Regions:
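A short, solvent-exposed beta-strand micro-motif common in secreted/extracellular proteins
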Residues: 429-440
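Extreme N-terminal flexible tails
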Residues: 19-90, 514-518
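Short strand-edge motifs at loop-to-beta-strand transitions and within beta-strands
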Residues: 421-425, 457-459, 548-552
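Residue-level hotspots within well-ordered secondary structure
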Residues: 466-593
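Short helix-loop-beta-strand segments that form the rim/entrance of peptidase-like active sites
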Residues: 168-212
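Structured interaction patches on ligand/partner-binding surfaces of diverse proteins
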Residues: 439-464
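Short, acidic Ser/Thr/Gly-rich low-complexity loop/linker segments typical of extracellular
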Residues: 395-428
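Metallocarboxypeptidase
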Residues: 213-390, 397-398
Length: 593
C-alpha cells in the first residue's frame, strides 16, 4: 500500500512537471510554532497560519518542491493541479467567472446603467502595460456623469491578483451590482455615486485565470516566462518593501517576487491606476481566511502612532463582517505600496475559507463582506482634502504632501492628482505641520489641527513658481533736485509687464494670493501709476534682458530732505489671480539735502 501510494505520488509529480502545474501537499499533523513559522514564511499556504491542523501547502515542481520535502519530509502529496474547467462532478460551478465572463458582466452593467457606468482598459493608462499574454486589464467605473472625469475623490476595489482565487471577483462584481442598483433607492449609495469616482477591477491577473480554467486550478501567479518555468507572484512584486520578507528568489516558487520591483505588467498597470486617480481608499480582495490584513508587513513595522491609526480603520472594516485581523504574509504587497507611494488608505481582505468553494458559499460570503465595504466607502473620510495649484494660471500640480512631526520610516509620501491637483491626507488626531511641495515651485507649510476623524478639513494651496530672484538696483545720491536711476531685473520674465511703484512704508504691506507684498497701499503708491515727471518709465514691458530702467526725479524742495521712500519692482502677469507674478525686495531711498 505504501509502495502504491508513493508510485501514484511519483506519477502525479511527473505529470505536474510535464504540464507545469502546481502540487498540493498536506501536513498530516499540527506543527510546533517554530516549524510552523518556517513553513508560513517560506511557502504558499492554503490556511492563515503554519500551525493550523490539516494544512495544505502549494508548490511548483522543481526546486521549491525539493525544498519542502527536504525540510518537511512528513508532508503528503494530495494531487496536482488540473483544469478547473474539467473538474467533476460538482464544479466548475456556473457562477464562477472566466475572464471573458467578467468582461461580459462589465458590459452588462454599462448597458443597464449607461449614465453611471463605463468600461476602461487600464492597460492604456500612462505607465501601464498589457499582460505577458497580450491581454487588457478591465475596470468598471461608477459615478454620476461617468463619461467625464470630474473633480471628485476616487475609490478603488480590486480582486484576483492571485489567479486561483475564483471567489474574489464575485465580491467586486457584487459591490458594483449593489451600488448601481441601490443608488436609486438608497440615499447613502446615491451620495456615494454622486460624490465619488469608484473604480472596480474584478481581475488583475487575466493570464493566470485563463491558466486556472484551462490547465491548473491551483495556479497562483501570472504567466511570465522564466525560462524553465512560469510566473511571478503579483502580490510580492510591488516596490514597497520588495524582497524584505515572505517572498522567494526561486523562479518556480509560488511566492517568486519577480526579477525587480514592479517588473510585471499587471503590477505596473495597477500602480498606473493609483497614480492616475490617487484614490482615497483602496481595498484588495483575496482568499482565503476571513481576515483583514494590516497594511504593513511584519518586517517593516510602522510607528506606534500610525499603527494605532490604521488599526482604527482596519477594525471598522472587519467588524461588520466579523472577520479577524492579521499581519500580511510578506512585504511587496499592493496595499502597503499604494499607502506608501500615494497616501491611499489601503487594506487587503481574505474572504471565505477556500479559493474555489461551492458557489453557494461564495454567494453567502459576498453578503457577509458587503457591509464592511459599504462602511468603508460611505463613512471613511480623510483628515484633509483640497487641491494644489500653481499660482501661475491656477493650473493643477502633482505635488507631494508631508507633515511633521514625521511618523514614517519607510519612505511614505502623499501625492496629489495630476489632472486636477486633488489630494487627501489621512492624519491621526493631533497638531501637525503640513507641507505641500511641487517641482518648480516654492513649498508652502501651515499648521493643521485634526480634532476628529472622518470630518475633512478643506485646504486648497496655491504654490508660487520658483525663479531666479528679482532684484532692484539704485544709482544716484538721492539729493533734492537730482535724478535717481532704478533698475528692475527679473530673469526669465521677458515680455511681461512691470511696475516700479513708490511707498512710504513696507508694513503691513498688501495681501496677494496668500503672499504679502512688502509695500503699503498708501497715496504715494497709488500715485505711482501716473507720477510723471517725478517718476518716469516706471510702467511698461520688460526688455529682452528681462530688465526695466526707471528714473526718480527728486523735486528740488529742501523740505523733502530726510523723507524715506520705498521703491518696489513688480512683474505683472495676468495668469496670476492678482495679476502680479513676483517682486524684488523693496529698496529704501532717503532724500538728501
Amino acid at each position: 500500500m505504501i509502495h502504491r501510494t508513493l508510485t501514484v505520488a511519483s506519477l502525479l509529480s511527473t505529470l505536474a512537471m510535464a504540464q507545469g502545474t502546481t502540487l498540493a501537499y498536506r501536513v498530516p499533523f499540527q506543527l510546533d510554532p517554530s516549524r510552523g513559522a518556517v513553513l508560513e514564511t517560506t511557502f504558499d499556504l492554503g490556511h492563515r497560519s503554519g500551525t493550523e491542523p490539516d494544512l495544505l501547502v502549494f508548490v511548483d515542481p522543481g526546486a521549491e518542491r525539493d525544498l519542502l520535502l527536504a525540510w518537511f519530509p512528513e508532508v503528503e502529496l494530495v494531487r496536482s493541479g488540473v483544469p478547473f474547467g474539467a473538474i467533476t462532478p460538482t464544479v466548475p460551478d456556473p457562477g464562477y467567472y472566466t475572464t471573458a465572463e467578467i468582461l461580459q458582466q462589465i458590459d452588462l452593467f454599462v448597458a443597464a446603467h449607461p449614465d453611471y457606468a463605463r468600461r476602461v482598459d487600464l492597460t492604456t493608462l500612462p505607465g501601464a502595460a498589457r499582460t505577458h499574454g497580450n491581454q487588457s486589464i478591465w475596470a468598471l467605473v461608477v459615478s454620476d456623469n461617468v463619461a467625464s472625469q470630474e473633480d471628485e475623490p476616487a475609490i478603488v476595489l480590486a480582486a484576483q491578483h492571485h489567479a486561483r482565487e475564483l471567489n474574489s471577483p464575485h465580491v467586486v462584481i457584487g459591490a458594483a451590482s449593489r451600488i448601481l442598483s441601490g443608488r436609486g433607492s438608497d440615499p447613502v449609495l446615491a451620495t456615494l455615486v454622486d460624490d465619488y469616482e469608484i473604480w472596480l477591477v474584478p481581475c488583475v491577473n487575466p493570464d493566470g485565470v485563463n491558466h486556472v480554467w484551462a490547465v491548473d486550478d491551483f495556479w497562483r501567479k501570472n504567466r511570465r516566462n522564466n525560462g524553465s518555468n512560469f510566473g511571478v507572484d503579483l502580490n510580492r512584486n510591488y516596490p514597497a518593501g520588495f524582497g524584505q520578507c515572505g517572498s522567494s528568489t526561486i523562479t518556480s516558487s509560488q511566492t517568486y517576487r519577480g526579477p525587480s520591483p514592479a517588473s510585471e505588467p499587471e503590477t505596473q498597470t495597477m500602480r498606473a491606476l493609483i497614480a492616475s486617480v490617487r484614490p482615497e481608499i483602496y481595498i484588495d480582495i483575496h482568499s482565503s481566511g476571513r481576515e483583514v490584513l494590516h497594511t504593513y508587513a511584519p518586517c517593516l513595522p510602522p510607528s506606534a502612532t500610525i499603527d494605532a491609526f490604521l488599526d482604527r480603520y482596519l477594525d471598522s472594516l472587519r467588524s461588520p463582517m466579523n472577520y479577524a485581523a492579521r499581519d500580511p504574509s510578506a512585504s511587496g504587497e499592493a496595499p502597503e505600496d499604494h499607502w506608501t507611494s500615494s497616501g491611499t488608505l489601503s487594506f487587503l481582505i481574505e474572504i471565505g475559507t477556500a479559493f474555489q468553494p461551492p458557489f453557494a458559499e461564495t454567494i453567502l460570503e459576498e453578503v457577509r463582506v458587503w457591509p464592511g465595504l459599504r462602511q468603508a466607502f460611505t463613512t471613511w473620510r480623510p483628515a484633509v482634502r483640497g487641491h494644489v495649484r500653481s499660482l501661475r494660471g491656477l493650473t493643477p500640480l502633482e505635488a507631494t504632501v508631508t507633515y511633521t512631526p514625521n511618523q514614517f520610516s519607510h519612505g511614505e509620501v502623499n501625492r496629489s492628482r495630476a489632472r486636477d491637483g486633488r489630494y487627501a491626507m489621512w492624519l491621526p488626531l493631533g497638531n501637525w505641520r503640513v507641507t505641500w511641495s511641487a517641482p518648480g515651485h516654492e513649498s508652502h507649510s501651515r499648521d493643521v489641527v485634526v480634532a476628529s476623524y472622518d470630518n475633512p478639513l478643506a485646504i486648497d494651496v496655491d504654490l508660487l513658481p520658483t525663479s531666479v530672484p528679482a532684484t532692484l538696483a539704485i544709482a544716484g545720491s538721492g539729493r533734492v533736485g537730482t535724478a535717481v536711476g532704478i533698475t528692475y531685473s527679473a530673469p526669465g520674465d521677458v515680455g511681461l509687464g512691470y511696475w516700479i511703484p513708490l511707498s512710504l512704508g513696507t508694513s503691513p504691506g498688501v495681501q496677494l494670493d496668500g503672499r504679502t507684498l512688502p509695500l503699503n497701499p498708501d497715496a504715494l503708491m497709488a500715485a505711482s501709476l501716473s507720477l510723471s515727471p517725478v517718476l518716469e518709465n516706471n510702467l511698461g514691458v520688460l526688455s529682452g534682458t528681462s530688465t526695466a530702467v526707471a528714473t526718480l526725479n527728486v523735486p528740488d524742495i529742501p523740505a523733502l530732505a530726510g523723507v524715506t521712500l520705498h521703491v518696489g519692482g513688480l512683474t505683472l502677469d495676468a495668469s496670476f489671480p492678482s495679476g502680479i507674478a513676483r517682486w524684488a525686495p523693496p529698496t529704501a531711498v532717503t532724500i538728501q539735502p
